[in-house]
């Protein structure tokens, strides 16, 4: 029985010695290069993540290309929808351009009519300046101008008579008061 016990006890001693050697070796390796190993592991993890994302995107692109190759009807429908959208947008743009042109034509017509009226009023000897400030009310949908009475100068008496103006010193008698100069009147300090 001693023989059976001897190989068993020798074997664990050998295993513990190899474990101790492994522990010492790994410990000294980590003590010397631990930070380098840690940073290289982190960097390797980041690189693997980036590469996996790119591989997924590449596979997705390949699948999309395969679908478009297999289904040309889908491509044709997309192109037709795109062409229809472009045509609609162009029609809207053309309609806006036509509205703008019509507006410009109306403005030019209005200017031309005002110039003709100004010329006619100059030929008749009237002043043309009074009509230039107000818009033409004949064409507008507003109230009729025949019911509006123009305001003239009223016959009211002014509140203050005599033409006295306290800000300028004009009027109000023979003398005019002026305020004195600022500062000491003697011109210096004591």
From Swiss-Prot:
Membrane topology listed for this record: Single-pass membrane protein
Post-translational modification: Truncated SELENOS proteins produced by failed UGA/Sec decoding are ubiquitinated by the CRL2(KLHDC2) and CRL2(KLHDC3) complexes, which recognizes the glycine (Gly) at the C-terminus of truncated SELENOS proteins. Truncated SELENOS proteins produced by failed UGA/Sec decoding are also ubiquitinated by the CRL5(KLHDC1) complex.
Pfam families for this protein: Selenoprotein_S
Primary localisation category: endoplasmic reticulum
Region entry Disordered, spans: 115-190
InterPro entries with a match to the protein in the record: Selenoprotein_S
GO molecular function, one term: antioxidant activity
Family per similarity comment: Belongs to the selenoprotein S family.
Compositionally biased intervals (Gly residues): 160-174
Region (VCP/p97-interacting motif (VIM)): 78-90
Transmembrane feature ranges: 28-48
Subunit text: Interacts with DERL1 and (via VIM motif) with VCP, suggesting that it forms a membrane complex with DERL1 that serves as a receptor for VCP. Also interacts with DERL2, DERL3 and SELENOK. The SELENOK-SELENOS complex interacts with VCP. Interacts with CCDC47.
Protein's organism: Mus musculus
GO biological process: cell redox homeostasis; cellular response to lipopolysaccharide; cellular response to oxidative stress; endoplasmic reticulum unfolded protein response; ER overload response; negative regulation of acute inflammatory response to antigenic stimulus; negative regulation of endoplasmic reticulum stress-induced intrinsic apoptotic signaling pathway; negative regulation of inflammatory response
Name this polypeptide is given: Selenoprotein S
Note: One of the histocompatibility antigen responsible for chronic graft rejection.
Cellular-component GO terms for this entry: cytoplasmic microtubule; Derlin-1 retrotranslocation complex; Derlin-1-VIMP complex; low-density lipoprotein particle; very-low-density lipoprotein particle
Keyword line: Cytoplasm, Endoplasmic reticulum, Membrane, Selenocysteine, Transmembrane, Transmembrane helix, Ubl conjugation
The organism's taxonomic lineage, starting at the top: Eukaryota, Metazoa, Chordata, Craniata, Vertebrata
Protein's cellular compartments: Endoplasmic reticulum membrane; Cytoplasm
Function: Involved in the degradation process of misfolded endoplasmic reticulum (ER) luminal proteins. Participates in the transfer of misfolded proteins from the ER to the cytosol, where they are destroyed by the proteasome in a ubiquitin-dependent manner. Probably acts by serving as a linker between DERL1, which mediates the retrotranslocation of misfolded proteins into the cytosol, and the ATPase complex VCP, which mediates the translocation and ubiquitination.
């Amino acid at each position: 029985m001693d023989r059976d016990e001897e190989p068993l006890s020798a074997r664990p001693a050998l295993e513990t010695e190899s474990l101790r050697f492994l522990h010492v070796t790994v410990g000294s390796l980590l003590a010397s290069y631990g930070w380098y190993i840690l940073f290289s592991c982190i960097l390797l993890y980041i690189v693997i993540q980036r590469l996996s994302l790119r591989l997924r995107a590449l596979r997705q692109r390949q699948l999309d290309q395969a679908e478009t190759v297999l289904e040309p009807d889908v491509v044709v429908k997309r192109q037709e929808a795109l062409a229809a959208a472009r045509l609609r947008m162009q029609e809207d743009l053309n309609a806006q351009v036509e509205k703008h042109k019509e507006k410009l034509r109306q403005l030019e017509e209005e200017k031309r009519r005002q110039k003709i009226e100004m010329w006619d009023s100059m030929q008749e000897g009237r002043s043309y300046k009074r009509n230039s400030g107000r818009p033409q009310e004949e064409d507008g949908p507003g109230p009729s101008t025949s019911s509006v009475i123009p305001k003239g100068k009223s016959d009211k008496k002014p509140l203050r008579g005599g033409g006295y103006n306290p800000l300028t010193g004009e009027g109000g008698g023979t003398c005019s008061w002026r305020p004195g100069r600022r500062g000491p009147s003697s011109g210096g300090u004591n």
